[in-house]
Amino acid sequence: MSCSKAYGERYVASVQGSAPSPRKKSTRGFYFAKLYYEAKEYDLAKKYICTYINVREMDPRAHRFLGLLYELEENTEKAVECYRRSVELNPTQKDLVLKIAELLCKNDVTDGRAEYWVERAAKLFPGSPAIYKLKEQLLDCEGEDGWNKLFDLIQSELYVRPDDVHVNIRLVELYRSTKRLKDAVARCHEAERNIALRSSLEWNSCVVQTLKEYLESLQCLESDKSDWRATNTDLLLAYANLMLLTLSTRDVQESRELLESFDSALQSAKSSLGGNDELSATFLEMKGHFYMHAGSLLLKMGQHGNNVQWRALSELAALCYLIAFQVPRPKIKLIKGEAGQNLLEMMACDRLSQSGHMLLNLSRGKQDFLKVVVETFANKSGQSALYDALFSSQSPKDTSFLGSDDIGNIDVQEPELEDLARYDVGAIRAHNGSLQHLTWLGLQWNSLPALPGIRKWLKQLFHHLPQETSRLETNAPESICILDLEVFLLGVVYTSHLQLKEKCNSHHSSYQPLCLPLPVCKQLCTERQKSWWDAVCTLIHRKAVPGNSAKLRLLVQHEINTLRAQEKHGLQPALLVHWAKCLQKMGSGLNSFYDQREYIGRSVHYWKKVLPLLKIIKKKNSIPEPIDPLFKHFHSVDIQASEIVEYEEDAHVTFAILDAVNGNIEDAMTAFESIKSVVSYWNLALIFHRKAEDIANDALSPEEQEECKNYLRKTRGYLIKILDDSDSNLSVVKKLPVPLESVKEMLKSVMQELENYSEGGPLYKNGSLRNADSEIKHSTPSPTKYSLSPSKSYKYSPKTPPRWAEDQNSLLKMIRQEVKAIKEEMQELKLNSSKSASHHRWPTENYGPDSVPDGYQGSQTFHGAPLTVATTGPSVYYSQSPAYNSQYLLRPAANVTPTKGSSNTEFKSTKEGFSIPVSADGFKFGISEPGNQEKKSEKPLENDTGLQAQDISGRKKGRGVIFGQTSSTFTFADVAKSTSGEGFQFGKKDLNFKGFSGAGEKLFSSQYGKMANKANTSGDFEKDDDAYKTEDSDDIHFEPVVQMPEKVELVTGEEGEKVLYSQGVKLFRFDAEVSQWKERGLGNLKILKNEVNGKVRMLMQREQVLKVCANHWITTTMNLKPLSGSDRAWMWSASDFSDGDAKLERLAAKFKTPELAEEFKQKFEECQRLLLDIPLQTPHKLVDTGRAAKLIQRAEEMKSGLKDFKTFLTNDQTKVAEEENKGSGTGAAGASDTTIKPNAENTGPTLEWDNYDLREDALDDSVSSSSVHASPLASSPVRKNLFHFDESTTGSNFSFKSALSLSKSPAKLNQSGTSVGTDEESDVTQEEERDGQYFEPVVPLPDLVEVSSGEENEQVVFSHRAEFYRYDKDVGQWKERGIGDIKILQNYDNKHVRILMRRDQVLKLCANHRITPDMSLQNMKGTERVWVWTACDFADGERKVEHLAVRFKLQDVADSFKKIFDEAKTAQEKDSLITPHVSRSSTPRESPCGKIAVAVLEETTRERTDVIQGDDVADAASEVEVSSTSETTTKAVVSPPKFVFGSESVKRIFSSEKSKPFAFGNSSATGSLFGFSFNAPLKSNNSETSSVAQSGSESKVEPKKCELSKNSDIEQSSDSKVKNLSASFPTEESSINYTFKTPEKEPPLWYAEFTKEELVQKLSSTTKSADHLNGLLREIEATNAVLMEQIKLLKSEIRRLERNQEQEVSAANVEHLKNVLLQFIFLKPGSERERLLPVINTMLQLSLEEKGKLAAVAQGEE
């Protein structure tokens, strides 16, 4: 409030007249003094304040006010004295201490008092810039003596505020004043990385002056040339930056002088150029910047000058921009350091962007403008004119860079729009997201035919911002997205363009550019728009000043409503229409289905907002305009009533396009047909042509062909309509989303297709359809096929779900190629099976590696020799726990090196290849067959077919490479060189592998005649060998004797997740039992974001041991709280999964510094904001006609048939080879693969909790697939020695490795130590061993130690993964013992049954006790998957009565456990064996063998009768039945089993009858176990066990040697889809034929009758259940304890919520009270204050005395 002197005198007189006493008058003096102070009557004010001080001398306010009056009179001494007295009376006045220090330093720095008050103020304001300036003044007065202290002061200040321009300049000046120029230059160079300093004109001026001084000093010394060149480089960069800032902020004269100085620097550097170095690259770039700034200066001169000749200036400016644009981009590799490279790259993009846009701007509307400029000014006279226009005529031209530069070689080259778009993206980074720069770029693109790439610009600035939000109705700042910012920029550019047009219409020359260069043009956006943009950038990049973020959030929140057109947005309808059209056009040009849906969806949003406004305009009503809108209204673009119909039509077209994008094709067609316009015709043509293409791709019937022709006719009709409308009205061409040429081209193509149909063209062959799989060609959608620009089309997918929309084309292509390749391979197999005279050809060093196409993998002929192209998966050496990621079982991509001559596809999965086992006859020792040595191949091998044929025939005749001959040397090193991996392998050579080039040279000799093909040379091998030779060690090369295993790619469980945060912390867990924090461990705390579903979780593992300490989701309801007593720790509560199950935990993380703790909190809250914006969208329903599924099914059937056919051929030929080699062969094994494809409806395991997928594999033993093209894959074979010669010379050893450990977790180690997995596509390589000479290995391997587990001589009747608990009586609650496989084991001898469970990994016993008849299982209350019982347990070594509980994941598994448990009690009484859980039943399943494979097999097989020897007959008669049924209504087909020798078994399997159970070989009762024979061979002590486990979706058997054991674990799966195969393989020296028969009838596997005594004992055991009543009571008590604990937690949570609510209410009351008190203070004494008295009395609960005082204050008496 201001008043005059007269008012003050009247008021003083009235108050003094009513005052009862002089003292009362004096007490009013303070108020009188304030009145005169406002009236600027300082003398009268001093008079009254002095009278007041005489009465109230202890009032600090009066002394402060008097000091202010003295300060205004510049009486510093008296002012300081008054301020000092006020501080003495009230020491809390911190600002007054700083004021005294400033006054003393200003008056006399040498005064000793100044230093005292400065130090006192420094303690009150640490880190204040004002304190620094005061200390700097004090040290400056000391001269040279204070330089060291001043240097320390500046350094400490820089540590706190590195961006402060004044401090940085002061440091450089201090260096310069002390002649430390090198340090000054180093400081300038270091500070160049700071963006805040680079944007300061004062700093850049300081840098230029410093570098110039340093260069002068270097020239005097002439010591270091490299230092001089580096400094010159920095000087040129500083000049360019200073020139840009000067043009923006200074006048024309200063800019001209600086440009002349820049010219001198370039001329000086030009004389020192030489070679390709950093200075040369920088000089070339600075030359471009020099000419660009020269052009900008010319236009700035026209902007500020009078009577300007715009034509002359614009032509000279165009010359400068042409030169700048044609300067090539610098060679970035010449620049040292990544920062320098990035800087120069950004500067180059900025130069090319600005110069290119200005060239287009200046030449717009002028024909051959650039050509005229080049012809006129690109010569000496034009150079002189340019020099005279820029510089003063006094300076000589020859000594300047501009006057001596050669400009005669420039071309007339207009910038390409694609290049400009790319340069713009790079320039965005150079300007750090400046709204002025973005608006300027948008204005340049606004006048061009193409759309600006605003989306790409914003992606450069805001990497992690989502593109669209699902919460358009909200205005929360956390929901801001890329589309909001893009809409904002479109609005700013739109309004700025209209404003420029209005200015240009008033006074504008034809040669004056519409938009001046960026450094010269005025501000293009309003202050409101700029402040909003800056606030958004500050919040997103987390650069808000503490305490200012709330204000920024309010600012952003207010304008988001406007951008999203919510509530009273006040937007002009024309702007809304502009937004809708631009977004629809941009969305149609994007390639991603999701991007199109979001852009066109936002366009529809704005159309819906503008349609009601159009109705208002149609009624000729006015639309209110806000007073201060975010986007200014321009009446020049107001929508007229005549335009409304057109806009409504555009809106409905956009609605229909969105329907098409979302897959609602029928709705889109209906909408388009209702709109009669060329746009709707074009979209209808696209839709019908797409339908025709879909049918043509799968056309199999005449009805579909006719439908395809109808669609093509409709397409033709709509295209003809477009052409007719365009001929009659040329204006409709502008509405077309594509050029007219695209319409004509598409019409021509459609006519050609119709002509082909009518004349029996490509789709017909001899009156019938061509083979769909071999001849069909996949057509791309017409939008991309016929549109000249990708921006003219949109994508939609009417037949597939959204997630397949983008991958459908590539998926179908891959399937067609697979089908074609499979058919060719089947035909080749038919041809090759009839050949028997081909020779086996072993690869030698002259055999080229490129004769086999990609995807073909040779067989492993030696034990454990893996293929070099095999995938890298888990093995026994590197086993990774799969507990945290279900992707563990997926196989990595095959590491195949493509070479020329390979197949057409760039990538073929390993499932397309197949391997053929090589018989052991192909590799023999010491057996000479001269006939084989004399033959040679007449034709070189050209492809894999020939190689395969020779391999098969060679094995059939029993011919192979022979060692032991002496005519020529044949070493293993040669073999290693000639093959492409370890061992002998057919496949591609890995050029990076040099493993066995020198191992075992001249160990064996061999004679091989003329088998090598002279046409195939080994040039590639020689090149590879030369690459590893060195000058000093050509003759010496050492190879390891035993190769290390290949490194396996470890699976951490964090695949597919992005690390948002990682920091080393110490984690604690609150133990409620002892009410204290317990340390969990040290490690890195990570915040991971799932890229698929957007969920965020927190994960921490201990150092070294990597045990999981924390693993839980981050939710929006979680709250971080500081740990009391520490500013470096945060605590929170979460449902943690680190121990396996969800468990509510209170966790705390302690950081090293408070800064790290604060950073964690910010990142945590940022993740919660990310979670708030996850779109809750459900995928669209699958609208599929089934064509893709049929094609996939057809391909899978063919592949399955191919594998069965190959297996049959391989086994048959192997058998023939064995019969012909009577003396040397033993039983060999073929290979087959049983593959059962999962149904399309088959889904993965159902989880109990939503959050349980963190440990999905931990308790899941079923592996299934829900995708047509995804299947679980197996791990790599176990790597062994290259040559395995440690087998016995007699006998045939067969070994098996389980394909999937069904009783344990996926991908765990089985008993033999091998890593197991599943693979339903890969072929199984069967290893074979033959009799021959025995060779001692060079380095013998250690003997295999048999691990004794204590479970020998026991059968596993039940095994499944579960969680085990023990009831703790002391604390009255259940405690977890561990997670692992719980087993029920029965001893073969005494039939005792026990429960055994070990923990995962550590294998510590959790349970080990007998099952007695008096034990009973009881369900725990609240869940039926938990069983509770009481037993005498020996897990800890001693007998102890325990109350135990086990929890299963699935209900059926829990029921199975109960059933087996009950059977175990009775089995012990009867002294009988229990039927294992795995052999109970088999689920009916589909045949894995395709019909095509059956047909091929029936055509190529022939019946063969084998003679069964006597022993075999006896054994075959006693085969044990194995349950394996297949219930099908049609012809049942089962893939042939392993080791099928002869056609009888095949005939049985492929008969029309229902499949019957079958067994393998000898199955005598003695020694057989669960259908598996373990009889010892006649002449050998070694035998091998085998167990084959087959799940419902996969079945695989792999060969693996193992030791003899008395029992074998029977693997099982949760869905009980298991087969048990019984086999017995007697080994003799003579050749033995094996035949597997299918018995017609077999007795049951287990049969037992109950005797009378057993029944009595069983009845008596039921009477003993009363003994367990106490146990049940204790369990009930334990359950109650758990419930009470949960109730306690709920109560504490309720109390916490109530406290939070009370705190919120209290905070609101305090805020209200503060507002009331402020209002009370500023109101005049009287009735207005009295009105607030009741409110204040009520809220403060004042006493009567206090109320009286407050009333007096309200009246103005006190």
UniProtKB/Swiss-Prot annotation:
One of its GO terms (cellular component) is nuclear pore. It holds the Pfam family GRIP. The modification Phosphoserine is found at S21. Gene3D superfamilies: Pleckstrin-homology domain (PH domain)/Phosphotyrosine-binding domain (PTB), Tetratricopeptide repeat domain. TPR repeats lie at residues 60-93, 584-617. Residues 176-229, 805-837 form a coiled coil. Residues 1595-1618 have a biased composition (Basic and acidic residues). Residues 1236-1245, 1581-1594 have a biased composition (Polar residues). Residues 1703-1753 form the GRIP domain. This is RanBP2-like and GRIP domain-containing protein 3. GO terms for biological process: NLS-bearing protein import into nucleus. Residues 1318-1330 have a biased composition (Acidic residues). One of the 8 copies of RANBP2 clustered close to the chromosome 2 centromere. Residues 761-805, 1216-1248, 1307-1335, 1581-1622 are annotated as: Disordered. It comes from the Eukaryota. Keywords: Coiled coil, Phosphoprotein, Repeat, TPR repeat. Residues 1037-1173, 1334-1470 form the RanBD1 domain. CDD domains: RanBD2_RanBP2-like, RanBD3_RanBP2-like. Residues 779-798 have a biased composition (Low complexity).
